[in-house]
């Protein structure tokens, strides 16, 4: 009986204790479900503030559609960022085809003529263009650090688009792309400003390019003209476009150091030459061939930047030459006979112009007539027998720097006389 009462007593005592334990357990579970307080460090707080400010600055640019319309492409969804150096640029998202479209159409001469835009690549070429006053409309770059190399005021109104370097590498014509490609408004020689060092050493020496159709040759010729101190370069119709990418690369910035006037008719060429300018033609005529009869050739290159007979000759309608003493001279065009002299003899004593013809089509009849009208001559560059002629770019460099030497010597003699 005592055992039975003791068991009942223990059950009554343990029951409230078990209930109390159950309540305590529930309280502990509820306490564990509470979210702990987050401790924010000072650096994390600053980082979050910057993220909030950056998110507020993400908004579409107002001139994006206008910029895309100018280059003939549709606008894409991009992010706008404001770097520390205050340049606002767009980050092109994956699938953005603006670069490929712009580069493709900018390499077309029809596009350049229609829209008046040219494509320049590389930091040096872009810098020279900006210094000369050319207007940069759109700049594609792969690294933000590249923007620091340009004057900030030159990029204020420019559409800056950051793209992956791989995209530039695909569309670049350079072996080692620099990650910079710019779309410029086609420069106008009247509105451009040239370096003071270039204008200070400018000579009364002009260059006329006649049927230069190789881009590499034309670019090299322009570079020689800038180095020799020519006052201007005139390109007649038939020459390759001076703003073709290959010409720009070979020119090494010569386009922005002296006036280059393109697509000229021969009728207006004299309007761009100073009064009293004598016109001289590059010629590979050899004195020992003077008494030899002219040979008829079907190759246009044989009538290249040179003539074969110093006497007056005619050209028939079928393109063949004939001497002036032949019986039938009907339906033939007159080609003037010009005196020939060696290039190292004195010829550059005043304002003068040198005409360089292309290696394929050579000098035009209009260039010969202009030289005759100005009392000019043909300049011969002696070469070893067996060598037909020199490259047009090589001939231009020889004649231009010889003209530079003669003009400078003449100026020195005149200065000594006046003193």
Curated annotation (Swiss-Prot):
Cellular component GO terms held in the UniProt record: mitochondrion
Main location: mitochondrion
Cellular location(s): Mitochondrion
Enzyme class: transferase
GO molecular function annotations of the record: RNA binding; rRNA (uridine-2'-O-)-methyltransferase activity
Enzyme nomenclature, EC number: 2.1.1.-
CDD domains in the cross-refs: SpoU-like_RNMTL1 (cd18106)
Coiled-coil annotated residue ranges, if any: none
Alphabetical keyword list: Methyltransferase, Mitochondrion, rRNA processing, S-adenosyl-L-methionine, Transferase, Transit peptide
Function according to Swiss-Prot or TrEMBL: S-adenosyl-L-methionine-dependent 2'-O-ribose methyltransferase that catalyzes the formation of 2'-O-methylguanosine at position 1370 (Gm1370) in the mitochondrial large subunit ribosomal RNA (mtLSU rRNA), a conserved modification in the peptidyl transferase domain of the mtLSU rRNA. Also required for formation of 2'-O-methyluridine at position 1369 (Um1369) mediated by MRM2.
PANTHER family cross-referenced by the UniProt entry: RRNA METHYLTRANSFERASE 3, RRNA METHYLTRANSFERASE 3, MITOCHONDRIAL
Family as reported in the entry's similarity comment: Belongs to the class IV-like SAM-binding methyltransferase superfamily. RNA methyltransferase TrmH family.
Name this protein carries in UniProt: rRNA methyltransferase 3, mitochondrial
Organism annotation: Xenopus laevis (African clawed frog)
Gene: mrm3
């Amino acid at each position: 009986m005592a055992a039975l009462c003791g068991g009942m007593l223990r059950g009554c005592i343990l029951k409230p204790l078990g209930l109390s334990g159950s309540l305590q357990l529930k309280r502990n579970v509820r306490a564990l479900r509470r979210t702990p307080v987050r401790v924010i460090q000072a650096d994390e707080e600053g980082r979050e503030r910057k993220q909030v400010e950056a998110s507020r600055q993400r908004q579409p640019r107002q001139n994006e559609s206008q910029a895309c319309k100018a280059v003939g492409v549709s606008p894409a969804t991009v992010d706008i960022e404001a770097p520390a150096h205050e340049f606002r640029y767009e980050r092109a998202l994956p699938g953005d085809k603006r670069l490929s479209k712009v580069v493709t159409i900018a390499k077309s001469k029809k596009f350049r003529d229609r829209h008046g835009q040219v494509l320049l690549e590389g930091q040096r070429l872009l810098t020279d263009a900006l210094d000369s006053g050319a207007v940069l409309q759109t700049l594609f770059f792969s690294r933000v650090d590249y923007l620091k190399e340009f004057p900030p005021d030159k990029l204020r109104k420019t559409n800056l688009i950051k793209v992956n370097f791989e995209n530039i590498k695909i569309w670049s014509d350079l072996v080692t792309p620099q990650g910079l490609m710019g779309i410029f408004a086609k420069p106008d020689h009247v509105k451009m400003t040239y370096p003071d060092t270039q204008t200070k050493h400018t000579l009364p020496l002009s260059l006329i390019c006649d049927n230069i159709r190789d881009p590499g040759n034309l670019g090299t010729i322009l570079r020689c003209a800038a180095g020799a101190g020519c006052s201007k370069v005139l390109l007649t119709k038939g020459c390759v476009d001076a703003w073709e990418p290959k010409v720009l690369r070979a020119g090494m910035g010569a386009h922005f150091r002296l006036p280059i006037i393109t697509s000229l008719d021969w009728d207006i060429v004299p309007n761009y030459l100073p009064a009293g300018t004598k016109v001289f033609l590059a010629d590979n005529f050899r004195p020992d061939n003077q008494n030899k009869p002219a040979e008829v050739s079907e190759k246009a290159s044989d009538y290249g930047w040179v003539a074969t007979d110093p006497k007056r000759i005619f050209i028939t309608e079928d393109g063949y030459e004939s001497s002036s003493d032949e019986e039938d001279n009907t339906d033939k065009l007159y080609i003037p006979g010009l005196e020939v002299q060696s290039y190292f003899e004195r010829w550059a004593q005043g304002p003068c112009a040198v005409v360089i013809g292309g290696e394929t089509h050579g000098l035009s009849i209009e260039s010969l007539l202009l030289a005759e009208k100005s009392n000019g001559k043909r300049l011969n560059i002696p070469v070893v027998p067996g060598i037909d002629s020199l490259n047009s770019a090589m001939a231009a460099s020889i004649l231009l720097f010889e003209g530079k030497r003669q003009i400078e010597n003449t100026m020195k003699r005149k200065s000594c006389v006046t003193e």
